[in-house]
Amino acid sequence: MVKPCWRIGAGMERSKINPTKVDGLTWYKDLGLHTFGEFSMAMIQANSVMEDQCQIESGPLTFNNPTVQGTFVGVYDGHGGPEASRFIADNIFPKLKKFASEGREISEQVISKAFAETDKDFLKTVTKQWPTNPQMASVGSCCLAGVICNGLVYIANTGDSRAVLGRSERGGVRAVQLSVEHNANLESARQELWSLHPNDPTILVMKHRLWRVKGVIQVTRSIGDAYLKRAEFNREPLLPKFRLPEHFTKPILSADPSVTITRLSPQDEFIILASDGLWEHLSNQEAVDIVHNSPRQGIARRLLKAALKEAAKKREMRYSDLTEIHPGVRRHFHDDITVIVVYLNPHPVKTNSWASPLSIRGGYPMHSTS
């Protein structure tokens, strides 16, 4: 019998009125309230152990300036194990608040420093665990973070998760991608790597009809993946499939996020932040159309279901049959998927009517069979 167990993270909201819930392999919160509107979030497990994590933090964004209020949203798509994505969920928001407190504001530099410090500390953890758990060097995570504050939305990304804005236009809605992705199958990412490593003919290798960095990984930026950042981990007892045949002198992968800043307008309805498991099956426009044309309650779960229906269709099977497949085997049909939909009020909430601080973590399942 499948027993997914979802552990609630520290500080996680446990409202009796509108709690987070679990239904089989799906974790969700159908509707909640953040500083500037409503939100919906959902996750579904495909791997034998859930590698995705997510969070939403709403309220003060600094420790010392109560006027800096906003909403932080994070989607962390782990690979090689759940350790890196869990580490990000534990650490990146406190680091963002720390650096924002130093400057008494949110900025691109503050967010980038939070990414860098999180990666640095995770690599320290890998170093400490190397003697007893060397495979931690092969664990990493994409990191997508959004911050809504002072009429601006900051989107920072390492890896291939995606943030898409739904903007009202001529009676409908138009998809506006806010994030920049780092995947070797994108021409821009390949050009970047070739320019950074001009003397390395194997920096990118085509394998099974997909481009991979050094033939092993598709993402070109990430948190973790120490074996591609520090040569000291490119040796035994790391598994042979992760060891590179040649020595390297500078990091192959970067943790530097691409950051975009968008000033919100009354036409901006919502933002969808999701791991690439969603975008493998839904286009940007398909996703925003679903959100625009559907009730808010449970919208994140509705997006999950739409993606799973497409995954089943591609494999010429029924959706109901797909839902019966156990984790691990299920990964052959779709990835772990995380979706957060953040609705935007046209006019920011006034200072004296801010919602209570909110902290919700999604993830931490420990799947087992018995």
UniProtKB/Swiss-Prot annotation:
<dbReference type="GO" id="GO:1900056">
    <property type="term" value="P:negative regulation of leaf senescence"/>
</dbReference>
<dbReference type="InterPro" id="IPR015655">
    <property type="entry name" value="PP2C"/>
</dbReference>
<keyword id="KW-0464">Manganese</keyword>
<dbReference type="GO" id="GO:0005886">
    <property type="term" value="C:plasma membrane"/>
</dbReference>
<feature type="binding site">
    <location>
        <position position="335"/>
    </location>
    <ligand>
        <name>Mn(2+) 2</name>
    </ligand>
</feature>
<comment type="subunit">
    <text>Interacts with SAUR19. Interacts with AHA2 at the plasma membrane.</text>
</comment>
<feature type="domain" description="PPM-type phosphatase">
    <location>
        <begin position="35"/>
        <end position="344"/>
    </location>
</feature>
<protein>
    <recommendedName>
        <fullName>Probable protein phosphatase 2C 67</fullName>
        <ecNumber>3.1.3.16</ecNumber>
    </recommendedName>
</protein>
<keyword id="KW-0460">Magnesium</keyword>
<feature type="binding site">
    <location>
        <position position="77"/>
    </location>
    <ligand>
        <name>Mn(2+) 2</name>
    </ligand>
</feature>
<feature type="binding site">
    <location>
        <position position="77"/>
    </location>
    <ligand>
        <name>Mn(2+) 1</name>
    </ligand>
</feature>
<dbReference type="GO" id="GO:0046872">
    <property type="term" value="F:metal ion binding"/>
</dbReference>
<feature type="binding site">
    <location>
        <position position="78"/>
    </location>
    <ligand>
        <name>Mn(2+) 1</name>
    </ligand>
</feature>
<keyword id="KW-0472">Membrane</keyword>
<comment type="function">
    <text>Dephosphorylates and represses plasma membrane H(+)-ATPases (PM H(+)-ATPases, e.g. AHA1 and AHA2), thus influencing negatively plant growth and fitness. Promotes the apical hook maintenance of etiolated seedlings.</text>
</comment>
<dbReference type="GO" id="GO:0004722">
    <property type="term" value="F:protein serine/threonine phosphatase activity"/>
</dbReference>
<comment type="similarity">
    <text>Belongs to the PP2C family.</text>
</comment>
<feature type="binding site">
    <location>
        <position position="276"/>
    </location>
    <ligand>
        <name>Mn(2+) 2</name>
    </ligand>
</feature>
<dbReference type="Pfam" id="PF00481">
    <property type="entry name" value="PP2C"/>
</dbReference>
<keyword id="KW-0479">Metal-binding</keyword>
<dbReference type="InterPro" id="IPR036457">
    <property type="entry name" value="PPM-type-like_dom_sf"/>
</dbReference>
<dbReference type="GO" id="GO:0016791">
    <property type="term" value="F:phosphatase activity"/>
</dbReference>
<keyword id="KW-1003">Cell membrane</keyword>
<dbReference type="InterPro" id="IPR001932">
    <property type="entry name" value="PPM-type_phosphatase-like_dom"/>
</dbReference>
<dbReference type="InterPro" id="IPR000222">
    <property type="entry name" value="PP2C_BS"/>
</dbReference>
<keyword id="KW-0904">Protein phosphatase</keyword>
<keyword id="KW-0378">Hydrolase</keyword>
<dbReference type="GO" id="GO:0005737">
    <property type="term" value="C:cytoplasm"/>
</dbReference>
